[in-house]
């Protein structure tokens, strides 16, 4: 096995996807430049082209026209007659159902992926991969002995064992129940921070997007309707994600201190303090915090006789109708964006207009990781 220290990928120029594919009455058109690391989520309704986009990246749609370049390696350039078939593309592909070899145990499944790559092209450390997915204790087990979450972790590890330059995850949690999703999510979070290759993650679950994705691509009927940082797109009132009961903002907060007596942790984002339930996190560590729009209320004056701990100075950016009698308010707080879903009557009573200074009262937060 390769036990030498893991090396960074040979090129960090990122991923270029400029392609078009016509299928009867459906047309996929994508023009994207993506970062060379981190998780990019493809999000959209069924039939929007998410899985088709992955298939184009993998070389499974030879009819697609355009360019695919991954970390400086041109996989497809139709104008130049370049098209590498799937077996010549250094990628890992994980589907909804973990496709493990039932006649091989976990270690043998991983060795299959490991041996696919010539020794000279291996940069993925074997032990690092086991640690990343937390599967060292599973090596002698057979696929039928694994839970759904364990099977997916092994499938991802097998894909990584081949030292891919790109990892494609096609709704890897769609077939899992809630407990198994909770089991695998912390390991998927590790991919976000510890892999030096781009990860393209297809999902239709907004909670997965909020927790995992650095960048977000919205697809509708084969077209890219928006692309950018996840935190930004989740709070744009011109996009559907910023509306409805599931709307909310994602903040990246640094741990400042812990209050052991009251079981609280003080965090800070953009110079703004945010108190959260006690976290097992080191001072200086960054936490991903989600504030649901339904958990934010607004006042014109700072309240002192309240049980709410987080009362943040804010200014109104924009307002948008959000269902019968409801208004979604976009707020700026220390340069970051928040959402508050309030009644239309409250918005009228407070006289909310863009630029108005208010206080956002945060009733609760969710620590995503």
From Swiss-Prot:
Report the GO terms under cellular component.
Answer: plasma membrane
Keywords (alphabetical) are:
ATP-binding, Cell inner membrane, Cell membrane, Membrane, Molybdenum, Nucleotide-binding, Translocase, Transport
Give, as one word, the top-level EC class.
translocase
Q: Where in the cell is it found?
A: Cell inner membrane
Q: What is its EC number?
A: 7.3.2.5
The catalysed reaction is:
molybdate(out) + ATP + H2O = molybdate(in) + ADP + phosphate + H(+)
Query: What NCBIfam families does its record include?
Result: modC_ABC
What is the designated name of this protein?
Molybdenum import ATP-binding protein ModC
Q: Name the gene.
A: modC
